[in-house]
């Protein structure tokens, strides 16, 4: 290189999967029957893990969130969101004609600030979305107190909290709906 510009070599990494791992990866891209087998396995695992819950699989957490919002709220309803979360969920709410209301997050784990949650409730508030961010559960005791006091459903965004627990109870099992992603 005679341009006087240093060029960094981009390292090449080998992806070293076992044959069984490649088989699993490729089965996702094969026909419906292969996916159907994988879906059945996943449903069985989830039913064993959450025996008291109704499980529905979606192609993405976004689609699940859309489905829950569309079938739970109506145009003009206010839904509380944490100020820090997945921005696309707010966009989905807006597309459905819902009115997002933001509640700030607490300083330690950046989950919804439960001290501010109660003051954000109005007569038009019809839902609360909480995000268990970075594997840290929200203070679900306080969230559910507000939910029960005002009879408002809680939707838990658990995309970052699979296998996380709040006081020995798994995230996604407190509210009206828990949405996981893998």
Stretch-by-stretch model annotation:
Residues 60, 84, 133:
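Flexible loop residues that form catalytic
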Residues 56, 80, 101, 153-155, ...:
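Structural detector of well-ordered beta-strand residues that form the stable sheet scaffold
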Residues 45, 55, 71, 92-96, ...:
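Alpha-helical structural signal in soluble globular domains
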Residues 68-120:
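Conserved PLP-anchoring active-site segment centered on the Schiff-base-forming lysine
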Residues 57-58, 81, 127-130:
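A short beta-strand submotif of the Rossmann-like class I SAM-dependent methyltransferase core
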Residues 108-181:
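Active-site phosphate-binding strand-loop segment of PLP-dependent enzymes
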Residues 1-67, 71, 148:
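Conserved PLP-binding active-site segment in aminotransferase class I/II-type PLP enzymes
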Residues 52-54, 58, 105-108, 168:
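Short, acidic/glycine-rich phosphate-metal binding loop used to engage nucleotide
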């Amino acid at each position: 290189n005679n341009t006087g510009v240093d060029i960094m070599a981009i390292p090449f990494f080998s992806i070293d999967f076992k044959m069984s791992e490649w088989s699993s990866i490729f089965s996702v891209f094969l026909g419906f029957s292969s996916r159907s087998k994988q879906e059945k396995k996943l449903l069985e695992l989830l039913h064993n893990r959450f025996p008291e819950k109704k499980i529905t699989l979606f192609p993405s957490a976004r689609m699940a969130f859309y489905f829950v919002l569309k079938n739970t709220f109506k145009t003009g309803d206010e839904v509380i969101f944490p100020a820090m979360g997945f921005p696309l969920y707010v966009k989905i709410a807006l597309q459905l004609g819902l009115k997002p209301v933001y509640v700030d997050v607490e300083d330690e784990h950046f989950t919804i600030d439960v001290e501010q949650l109660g003051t954000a409730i109005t007569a038009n508030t019809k839902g609360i979305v909480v995000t268990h961010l970075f594997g840290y559960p929200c203070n679900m005791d306080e969230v559910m107190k507000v939910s029960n006091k005002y009879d408002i459903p809680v939707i838990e965004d658990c995309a970052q909290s699979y296998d996380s627990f709040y006081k020995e109870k798994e995230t996604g099992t407190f509210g009206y709906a828990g949405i996981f992603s893998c």
